[in-house]
Amino acid sequence: MHIKRSIEKIPGGMMLVPLFLGALCHTFAPGAGKYFGSFTNGLISGTVPILAVWFFCMGASIRLSATGTVLRKSGTLVVTKIAVAWVVAAVASRILPENGVEVGFFAGLSTLALVAAMDMTNGGLYASIMQQYGTKEESGAFVLMSLESGPLMTMVILGTAGIASFEPHVFVGAVLPFLVGFALGNLDPELRDFFSRAVQTLIPFFAFALGNTIDLSVIGQTGLLGVLLGISVIIITGIPLIVADKVLGGGDGTAGIAASSSAGAAVATPVLIAEMVPAFKPVAPAATTLVATSVIVTSVLVPIITAMWSKRVKGGDGTVPKEDAVEEKAEQQRRRIIK
């Protein structure tokens, strides 16, 4: 049976399928973890410790060395995405109720959901798109996008926008596993190779644990709203990203569209923030489902829109010839001249 292959046909499947299975478990057998106890309960309720290991391994996978072009491109995209999320947070906090919208079509929508959906880019999706439609430097720009993974940027945005307050030691606690992994991975390439292998492996485990915090009735209530949120993420973050890529990044806007997605890791953010600030606990389940839907929507639409944009600005099929293809073509031309 090709279970893995089938799951990967779904955009973000390795995150979303276990998430849905966890939600099924929580909805129809909410006491399963306590009933079985031991390791089973650990898998069901271990969101935070599993994510802590994942953040450590994510940090270890990042290389310190990068060219100036890569850093400029990735820095431009990351800063722009965070800045847009901050503006959205500042505006939403003055419009939406403190506990989110509780009735009507927009029930479940909260400032936390908006920020979590918008402040992180799906680095893997970006890299795969830009390998086809961008240069080598552009596809390598996801190097700094990994720094967005985790609740730190969301904490910074919520804190600086005056929506929540976090003690300094809480900030340190949120980023410390990532920094320790980052340090070890750059001190020893073998450790980087060893720990980076676990990044993809751990995703289904923390997704299943996250799912066990969600009731399926919440998914039913927020499904269409989540689709609208995903489209909004592409529009609201995509336009500034295109402008920033052209003006500051030296690109043609393709990288900006490719970065206008919701990251799979963002699905975990509402629960993690709620663990630190209990005031967010009432809105965390709905925010989680909204962000999960946004991940699906952006994972499907962003590659399509990026391809259309690239064809418009580059012509042809929109792809960029790779170095080996360019060299081969040049060699063929030299041979014709010699003949």
UniProtKB/Swiss-Prot annotation:
Start-end of Basic and acidic residues biased regions = 320-339
Record GO terms (molecular function): 2-keto-3-deoxygluconate:proton symporter activity
Q: What is catalyzed by this enzyme? A: 2-dehydro-3-deoxy-D-gluconate(in) + H(+)(in) = 2-dehydro-3-deoxy-D-gluconate(out) + H(+)(out)
* Renumbered residue ranges of the record's region Disordered: 315-339
InterPro entries recorded: 2keto-3dGluconate_permease, 2keto-3dGluconate_permease_sub
Which Pfam families would you find in this protein's record? KdgT
Q: Cellular location of this protein?
A: Cell inner membrane
Activity modulation:
Uptake is inhibited by the protonophore uncouplers carbonyl cyanide m-chlorophenylhydrazone (CCCP) and 2,4-dinitrophenol, and by NaN(3).
**Domain of life, source organism:** Bacteria
Identify the GO cellular component terms for this protein: plasma membrane
Expression induction or repression? Repressed by the HTH-type transcriptional regulator KdgR. Induced by galacturonate and polygalacturonate, but not by external 2-keto-3-deoxygluconate.
Look up and give the membrane topology term: Multi-pass membrane protein
Is Cell inner membrane tagged as a keyword?
A: yes
* TM regions (residue ranges): 10-30, 42-62, 77-97, 100-120, 141-161, 163-183, 199-219, 224-244, 254-274, 289-309
Sorted alphabetically, the keyword list is: Cell inner membrane, Cell membrane, Membrane, Sugar transport, Symport, Transmembrane, Transmembrane helix, Transport
What does the record give as the function of this protein? Catalyzes the proton-dependent uptake of 2-keto-3-deoxygluconate (KDG) into the cell. Can also mediate the uptake of glucuronate with a low affinity, and may mediate the uptake of 5-keto-4-deoxyuronate (DKI) and 2,5-diketo-3-deoxygluconate (DKII), which are intermediates in pectin degradation.
Family per similarity comment = Belongs to the KdgT transporter family.
Can you name this protein?
A: 2-keto-3-deoxygluconate permease
Q: Please tell me the species this chain comes from.
A: Dickeya chrysanthemi
